[in-house]
Regions:
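Noncatalytic, beta-rich nucleic-acid-contacting surfaces in large DNA/RNA-processing enzymes
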Residues: 1-286
Length: 286
């Protein structure tokens, strides 16, 4: 789900257990801000010092909270602006001592004042609302139209999808994920692959599966929804680019190949390596 798909944001969901839209907005602010979550709001929430909705997630939270505590609206705005730009943290807000005194006069908790002083950058709530609304809509499809969701995700977002690595059962996927996790020297390519493998693992746990690539039915670049799963495209074969995939789909039209060699001669933008990989993936079984 966009906004909440990295390990960092998924752990944030585990730590906060959100139950309403407003909390999701705070989490969006936490993840897009600088020095807002780690070493700041997370510690306050985990320790029980404050709830998610009491901490600072977005710029607007500061001004609205300070006004609700009785501070002058203009001063509340100035504090918000200084904090969200990192001026307080950087020691460039000359009025900060006076503002602190004023906040204490209005019973603003010390933990809140200390939290403000740690912030380097704050996200605007309007942007958080737009992002979370988008994520919420996509989450609906993930729950209620899962195959449409996964087909779109793998077609557009999963650039690291490798049929040889990803089209396996749940146990094999889990082992591969652990293998990459435990490899301190894992490459950037392997890290990207692991993110895709995690979604494939989830896909399998939900009772779906990947069908073998089919030289007659597979699309060039998009995953096709089938009765119980997805049919991977030609571009999911390692090293097989979009140009060769589109050429293959065009040249197979109206054909009924009698051998692998005939297919290879017809679809001549595919290398022998591609043909061998397609054979290993069961693409010629039909």
């Amino acid at each position: 789900i966009p906004e909440f798909n990295t390990r960092f944001t998924r752990q944030m969901l585990v730590d906060t257990q959100p139950k309403d839209f407003n909390t999701l907005l705070r989490l969006s602010g936490f993840s897009h801000g600088t020095d807002v979550w780690l070493g700041n709001a997370k510690d306050l929430i985990v320790s029980g010092t404050a709830s998610v909705l009491e901490t600072v997630g977005c710029r607007d939270d500061i001004m609205l909270y300070l006004i609700s505590m009785g501070l002058d609206p203009k001063m509340s705005f100035k504090i918000m602006e200084a904090v969200r730009k990192g001026k307080v943290k950087g020691g460039k807000a000359g009025d900060w001592p006076m503002w602190v005194e004023e906040m204490r006069k209005h019973d603003v908790p010390e933990w809140y004042i200390e939290s403000l002083a740690k912030i380097g950058y704050l996200f605007p709530k309007a942007h958080a609302v737009a992002y979370v609304m988008m994520a919420f809509r996509i989450a609906w499809f993930k729950v209620h139209e899962p195959l449409a969701f996964y087909a779109t995700f793998f077609s557009i977002r999963a650039k690291a999808f490798d049929a040889a690595e990803c089209c396996k059962d749940a146990d094999a996927l889990r082992r591969r994920i652990r293998e990459i996790e435990n490899n301190k020297d894992a490459t950037a390519v392997e890290q990207d692959l692991m993110t895709t493998l995690e979604v494939c693992y989830e896909f399998c746990l939900r009772g779906f599966h990947f069908e073998p690539i089919d030289i007659y039915r597979s699309d060039a670049t998009k995953f096709v929804v089938t009765e119980n799963g997805l049919l991977p495209p030609f571009t999911s074969v390692r090293g097989l680019g979009e140009t060769a995939a589109l050429d293959t789909v065009e040249k197979r039209k109206g054909k009924d190949f009698t051998s692998v060699e005939e297919f290879s001669l017809c679809c001549n933008k595919l290398s022998q390596t591609h043909i061998d990989q397609l054979r290993a993936l069961g693409a010629f079984a039909g």
